């Protein structure tokens, strides 16, 4: 767990063009961490029905606005994009740079694949690599961070490549749908990098809609269906207020298996994404009678119920936000919990199966 995580608060940084941006404060971080929230990214994460090119398009507005902010703060000067295949293809970094008049000097490509022996994962291997070095530049990356193994593997490879060329990076800007593990990993990496690049400014990490958590190893969740180190949920994370508000304004999104599911499958192998979502909801339907609904609610909201306003503020890391906003969000959550009393998990599962198959019928083989 991240040191001093309980002391971390989110504070508003800007609100512009429909994009809310928050900065993490109070963690004695070596790096900078931001959370951005925007209508299309909220839709992407609340509705697994968003598939194909729309997955990419959903991230354009938030990414472009953040690029503009970073350019104005002089965090990005000369840019070099690192595309870690295939997850990076969902992130509109080049398009956002173009929109915000940021010159992209080069684009590098890498792929990292898991190595298995006797059915067990034994490591990661760089399968494809085409790197370009831009001295003293900003490296731009877009990637989902769950366990973070792929990102660390690729970054160490790139940094070693730069060192062999006798050049260095100024900083690294990372756009991610990711979890708390990412903060822990990037703090350690910055310490590691500064041993041989003392002037390295660190990572600027932009999380879409929140810093989520992964189910820990051996934990399949209250439903017994979740995948450890892969599936994202709220508990132990920090959620953008607008995302919390939108999620709890609807009955079902909070109970999805994962906040994002498999980003690559959602865009390129839609039938696999459909299978995963339907497999989950059919699993919930089958075992609904044995799932403790109260425990599931507490797991998904991230805290025991009932909870006082003061404890809720601390748990959400909202103590530095406007009190009118947080009071409203607290009351909304109480209303959501109350409204769930008369709704069965079977009803939710049947509704989701019907909605999902109806919306994505054209993709179902």
Task: Please state what every model-predicted region is.
Residues 1-365:
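PRPP-associated nucleotide enzymes
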């Amino acid at each position: 767990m991240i040191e001093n995580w309980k002391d971390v608060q989110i504070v508003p940084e800007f609100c512009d063009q429909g994009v809310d941006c928050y900065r993490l404060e109070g963690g004695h971080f070596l790096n900078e961490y931001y959370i951005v929230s925007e209508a299309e990214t909220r839709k992407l994460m609340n509705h697994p029905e968003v598939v194909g090119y729309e997955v990419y398009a959903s991230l354009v507005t938030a990414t472009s606005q953040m690029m503009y902010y970073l350019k104005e703060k002089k965090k990005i000067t000369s840019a070099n994009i690192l595309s870690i295949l295939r997850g990076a293809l969902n992130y509109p970094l080049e398009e956002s740079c173009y929109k915000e008049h940021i010159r992209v000097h080069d684009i590098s490509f890498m792929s990292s694949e898991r190595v298995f022996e006797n059915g067990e994962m034994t490591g990661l291997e760089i399968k494809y690599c085409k790197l370009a070095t831009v001295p003293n530049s900003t490296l731009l990356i877009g990637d989902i961070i769950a366990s973070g193994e792929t990102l660390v593997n690729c970054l160490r490879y790139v940094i070693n490549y730069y060192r062999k060329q006798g050049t260095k990076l100024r900083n690294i800007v990372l756009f991610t749908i990711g979890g708390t593990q990412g903060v822990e990993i990037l703090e350690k990496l910055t310490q590691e990098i500064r041993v041989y690049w003392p002037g390295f400014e660190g990572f600027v990490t932009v999380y879409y809609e929140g810093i989520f958590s992964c189910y820990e190893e051996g934990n399949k969740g209250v439903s017994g269906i979740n995948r450890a180190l892969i599936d994202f949920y709220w508990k132990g994370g920090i959620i953008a207020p607008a995302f919390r508000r939108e999620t709890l304004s609807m009955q079902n999104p909070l109970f999805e298996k994962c906040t994002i599911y498999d980003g690559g499958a959602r865009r390129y192998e839609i039938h696999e994404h459909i299978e995963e979502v339907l497999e989950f909801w059919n699993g919930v339907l089958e075992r609904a009678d044995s799932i403790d609904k109260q425990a599931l609610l507490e797991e998904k909201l991230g805290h025991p119920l009932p909870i006082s306003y003061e404890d809720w503020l601390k748990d959400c890391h909202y103590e530095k936000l406007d009190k009118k906003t947080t009071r409203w969000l607290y009351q909304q959550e109480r209303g959501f919990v109350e409204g769930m009393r008369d709704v069965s998990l079977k009803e939710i599962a049947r509704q989701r199966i019907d909605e999902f198959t109806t919306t994505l019928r054209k993709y179902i083989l």
